[in-house]
Design a protein with these regions (language model features):
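A short helix-loop-beta-strand connector motif used in the catalytic cores of GNAT acetyltransferases and
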Residues: 45-56, 74
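Acyl-donor binding region in acyl/amide transferases
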Residues: 82-155
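Short, His- and charge-rich active-site/binding loops that engage polyanionic ligands
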Residues: 60-90
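Beta-rich nucleic-acid/ligand-interaction surfaces
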Residues: 42-46, 147-149
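Short connector loops at helix/strand junctions that flank enzyme active sites
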Residues: 50-52, 64, 92-97
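Short amphipathic alpha-helix that is part of the acyltransferase structural core
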Residues: 1-43, 54-56, 63
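Short loop/turn segments at secondary-structure transitions that flank enzyme active sites
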Residues: 26, 73-75, 105
Length: 155
């Protein structure tokens, strides 16, 4: 069974954080060719800090999927990295989180679950459940066109 749970940045073990950041490099730099900060085969940035929580999907001890959460009133990608791309957009300061660095490792997922296990959909539901369980009003995120298509299919 796929276990999905949340951890604070400070709770990540060295082994788990190395796996997380290596899979993020594989996804965002190697596969999607994004301009991201990479070092020692890992992708991480200034938003991976003590203000951050992660939702992790683990199966048989292997990390399959993850997303990063930061409360919207704290420094995050929307208000800091991408703010120049938007005109004067007023975002709520409290009650919302920003999600970023969503990924599902396709290779591991196919190897462990085959082609017919809806990991992305299950993970989207887990993100919504996390938000509701922790009292957030909603989630803000910036997505690529491909991710927008996946989100629309999810409902």
């Amino acid at each position: 069974m796929l276990e999905i749970f949340d951890v604070r940045y400070d709770e990540l073990t060295d082994i788990r954080s190395e796996d997380l950041y290596k899979l993020r490099k594989k996804t965002f730099k190697d596969r999607l060719n994004w301009e991201v900060n990479c070092s020692n085969g890992m992708e991480f940035d200034e938003y991976d800090n003590s203000d951050t929580r992660y939702l992790l999907g683990i199966y048989q001890g292997q990390l399959i999927c993850s997303v990063r959460f930061i409360e919207l009133h704290l420094p995050n990608m929307i208000t800091h990295t991408f703010n120049a791309l938007f005109d004067d957009v007023a975002l709520p300061k409290r009650g919302y989180i920003e999600s970023s660095r969503f990924f599902v490792d396709k290779t591991r997922a196919k190897l462990l679950f085959g082609n017919h296990y809806p990991i992305s959909y299950l993970f989207f539901l887990s993100i919504i459940n996390y938000s509701r369980h922790n009292g957030y009003t909603g989630i803000y995120t910036i997505v690529s066109r491909a991710m927008l298509t996946i989100l629309k299919r999810s409902g």
